[in-house]
Amino acid sequence: MENNFDTICAIITPLALGAVGIIRISGEESFNIARKIFSNDFEIRKINYGFIVDKDNNKIDEVILLPFKGPKSYSGEDVVEIQTHGSPVIINSILELIIEHGARIAQRGEFTKRAFLNHRIDLSQAEAVLDLIQSKSKKSAQSALSNLGGYLKNEINNLKTDLVQIYSRVIASIDFPEDVLEVDKKDIVSICSDKILEIDKILNNAKSSDFIKDGINLSLIGAPNVGKSSLFNCLLNYNRSIVTPIAGTTRDTIKETINLDGYLINFIDTAGIRDKSKADLVEQIGIENSIRAINNSDIILFLF
């Protein structure tokens, strides 16, 4: 098992040819490692210009070095970010040098894990980081950014505070009936009912967030040759499905996604549904897949 608080490092930009690459170091040895490989003295929370050098003082690259003192950093620890030129050869050379000086490669998501363990973010914000990285539309990015900023966290904390206050009032009235005003049962029931509505709202918003993040599944369903594939191609604005006058041309489900005003719509073309006894084995399997598509759809568009 890895030590949760040793010093870790990773390339945090795509490893491909580009103008800039970024390497992050996080942990108590971050600054010491940076001092060993950076050509100049550096200041915390300043933009520092210089060179990365190896043990023989040979220059590897001209870089910008950004040190962040914990807990005011992404992970809550001492952090150093090194902006290099975007050559994979250069980036890997610097990463290897950092490892030689005592850091280890971070596991997937470990910087965010440390931010969570150091109470920089809560679980909802940690999940929002991944949602933001994987967002496929403006709406999903906005939703993730809202949660990263603490919207869901604040909603839950406010709800928790109110429920604890209600609980404390009830317990105090039971344990100290002579010293505490009697609790109005109707008042408590009314407050609890309001809180249940707030919980339902949070749960409904979570379901809506799933639609925003993963898209809405819309299946085109109907008998063979009613125009499902033609409509599918029209919606996509290019010929994705094969269209012929022959019944049963579409044998399997075909899924394509479009971005409609910031929302993802997953259009699903399906095999025509008809009496299986009139279909061959391959078409029968396609019909079964169409039925599964119906069960997994958010919206079903029947064509006749």
Predicted feature residues:
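Short, surface-exposed connector motifs at secondary-structure boundaries
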Residues: 78-79, 298-300
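Conserved beta-strand segments of the P-loop GTPase G domain that flank and frequently precede/overlap
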Residues: 302-304
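Glycine/charge-rich, flexible interdomain linkers and switch-proximal surface loops
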Residues: 109-117, 147, 151, 207-222
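A glycine-rich (often HGG/GG-containing) alpha/beta subdomain
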Residues: 1-142, 146, 161
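Long, non-coiled-coil amphipathic alpha-helical linker/lever segments
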Residues: 120-198
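Conserved G1/Walker A P-loop phosphate-binding module
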Residues: 6-7, 17, 24-25, 37-39, ...
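Short secondary-structure transition/capping segments
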Residues: 97, 152-163, 218, 222, ...
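A short linear-motif detector with a strong N-terminal bias
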Residues: 1-4, 30-31, 44-45, 60-62, ...
